């Protein structure tokens, strides 16, 4: 890695000024303020070792909108990784084929490892239960379109233990003034202790709720995540939790006026489709915001 090389691995590494710069840049791209030649002649390697729809496609769309090209890993089974090649060796080789790498990997810390051996910038597209900075930046971008990111109450509901999107978002929101985090999670799926301790150490107010009804009147943002069926060995327990944590139009009648509902997608049963047509439902708009925010990220690290 060269000294000047810029990576985006975790929002915890970023200053608020860096985040705000990317959000402003994304807003300009979203308004159509670009030529389509910003990254002409540049190549982005898209290395995904886990399934993805939105992250993979929006990074690809972002690169192409700026005039660049995509080098896609394709199926992991068709690569030398199945022969035992290490991630480090794979990254070293692919660095010679491209101008930047976006990496998704099931192992936490994989993106940081890749950045240490790569000769081009690395963007973390999600690593295990760790960080997902591009998702967090588009989450912030979506919130900022509805309200100022300060003096707000944000509810985080669902799988907070293994969900990398909520881990990243919590630390990003901690960089803004007077943001209070409300957690609503099943037993055993709240934030890990080390994350709670780290958040409290940097002054974040964490408020735990047993039921979503307790939190809704206070929230400006409700961020819902998918409960993962594989975390529940008992299918009856999963069904009970899924129904308890399901967001419905009737439930939202007690929400604070102006509250917005976000979800990193894909959703399963946690949000009733009847919510989709309500003014508070911003999750499809949130997904669409992935393109301008990733345009901003690619332009920043490559140019």
UniProtKB/Swiss-Prot annotation:
Question: Which parts of the sequence bind carbamoyl phosphate?
Answer: 54-55, 104, 132, 135, 265-266
Q: What class of enzyme is it?
A: transferase
Q: Any idea of its EC number? A: 2.1.3.2
> Which residues of the sequence carry a binding annotation for L-aspartate?
83, 164, 226
Q: Which reaction does it catalyse?
A: carbamoyl phosphate + L-aspartate = N-carbamoyl-L-aspartate + phosphate + H(+)
Keywords from the named record? Pyrimidine biosynthesis, Transferase
Q: Matching Gene3D superfamilies, A to Z?
A: Aspartate/ornithine carbamoyltransferase
> Which SUPFAM superfamilies does the entry link to?
Aspartate/ornithine carbamoyltransferase
Spans through the membrane = none
Q: Which GO terms describe its molecular function?
A: amino acid binding; aspartate carbamoyltransferase activity
Role according to the record: Catalyzes the condensation of carbamoyl phosphate and aspartate to form carbamoyl aspartate and inorganic phosphate, the committed step in the de novo pyrimidine nucleotide biosynthesis pathway.
NCBIfam families recorded? asp_carb_tr (TIGR00670), PRK00856.1 (NF002032)
Q: What does the annotation say about its assembly with partners?
A: Heterooligomer of catalytic and regulatory chains.
Q: What is this protein called?
A: Aspartate carbamoyltransferase catalytic subunit
What is the species of this protein?
A: Methanocorpusculum labreanum (strain ATCC 43576 / DSM 4855 / Z)
Classification of source organism? Archaea, Methanobacteriati, Methanobacteriota, Stenosarchaea group, Methanomicrobia
């Amino acid at each position: 890695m060269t000294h000047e090389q810029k990576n985006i691995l975790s929002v915890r590494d970023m200053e608020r000024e860096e985040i705000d710069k990317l959000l402003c840049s994304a807003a300009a791209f979203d308004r159509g303020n670009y030529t389509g030649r910003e990254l002409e002649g540049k190549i982005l390697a898209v290395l995904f070792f886990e399934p993805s729809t939105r992250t993979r496609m929006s990074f690809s769309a972002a690169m192409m909108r700026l005039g660049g090209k995509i080098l896609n890993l394709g199926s992991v089974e068709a690569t030398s990784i199945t022969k035992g090649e290490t991630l480090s060796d794979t990254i070293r080789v692919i660095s010679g084929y491209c101008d930047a790498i976006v990496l998704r990997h099931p192992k936490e810390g994989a993106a940081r490892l890749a950045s240490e051996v790569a000769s081009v910038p690395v963007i973390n597209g999600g690593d295990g239960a760790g960080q997902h900075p591009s998702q967090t930046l588009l989450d912030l971008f979506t919130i900022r379109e509805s309200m100022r990111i300060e003096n707000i109450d944000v509810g985080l509901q669902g799988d907070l233990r293994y969900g990398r999107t909520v881990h990243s978002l919590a630390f990003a929101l901690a960089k803004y003034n007077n943001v209070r985090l409300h957690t609503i999670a099943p037993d055993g799926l709240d934030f890990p202790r080390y994350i709670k301790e780290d958040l409290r150490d940097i002054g974040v107010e964490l408020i735990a709720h047993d039921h979503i009804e307790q939190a809704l009147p206070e929230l400006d943002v409700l961020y819902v995540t998918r409960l993962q069926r594989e975390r529940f060995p008992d299918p009856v327990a999963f069904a009970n939790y899924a129904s308890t944590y399901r967001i419905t139009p009737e439930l939202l009648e007690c929400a604070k006026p102006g509250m917005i509902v976000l979800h990193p997608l894909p959703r399963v049963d946690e949000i009733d489709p009847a919510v989709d047509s309500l003014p508070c439902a911003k999750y499809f708009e949130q997904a669409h915001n992935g393109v301008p925010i990733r345009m901003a990220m690619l332009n920043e690290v490559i140019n």
